[in-house]
A protein has these predicted regions:
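Sec-dependent bacterial lipoprotein signal peptides
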Residues: 1-18
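N-terminal non-catalytic regions of secreted/periplasmic and cell-surface proteins
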Residues: 18-60, 122-131
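Beta-strand-rich interaction surfaces with strong enrichment in secreted/lumenal proteins
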Residues: 24, 97-99
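Short acidic, glycine-rich loop/turn motifs
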Residues: 55, 112-114
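Extended, solvent-exposed segments with strong compositional bias
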Residues: 60-97
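Surface-exposed, short loops/turns at beta-strand junctions within beta-sandwich domains
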Residues: 99-105
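A short tyrosine-centered beta-strand micro-motif
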Residues: 107-110
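Short acidic/polar inter-strand loop motif in beta-rich domains
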Residues: 114-121
């Protein structure tokens, strides 16, 4: 019993320390909405394998959702252009949604997964001027 505990406890500690988080920012560049990793984030991933944009309130409609195989995550580097299909083998275990138009004055949440255990997120708003 003691031997099992001595093996399990370090394993749990090691596995729990493998994940990380980072902040995403929505920015307008060249007439497109792009998602970048915040320069202030302690983690600076270069690529991703999963992204989702949803309304923060109301019907919580999903505006864009895509996920590719873990093996293909390095094919999709930041910055990520809103609505542009991710490269690689798309996963079939969840519904994908192509990029839908935004509404002004609505707050949106963006979330992304990098590798197996990197998680990014952020919020953004399209203002009355469309910015």
């Amino acid at each position: 019993m003691l031997r099992t505990i001595l093996i399990i406890v370090p394993l749990v500690i090691m596995l729990s320390s493998c994940s990380y988080v980072y902040d995403l920012h929505a920015v307008a560049m060249n007439g497109q909405l792009m998602f970048i990793v915040s320069p202030a984030s302690s983690q600076q991933p270069e690529c991703l394998r999963d992204i989702e944009v949803v309304e923060e309130s109301g019907g919580r409609e999903t505006l864009w959702s895509e996920s590719v195989s873990y093996d293909d995550d390095s094919a999709n580097e930041f910055p990520v252009v809103y609505g542009v299909a991710l490269k690689g083998q798309h996963l079939t275990d969840r519904k994908e949604v192509s990029g839908k138009p935004f509404q002004r004055g609505v707050i949106y949440n963006v979330s992304a997964t990098t590798g197996a255990m990197g998680y990014g997120g952020g919020r953004f708003l399209i203002d009355a001027d469309g910015r």
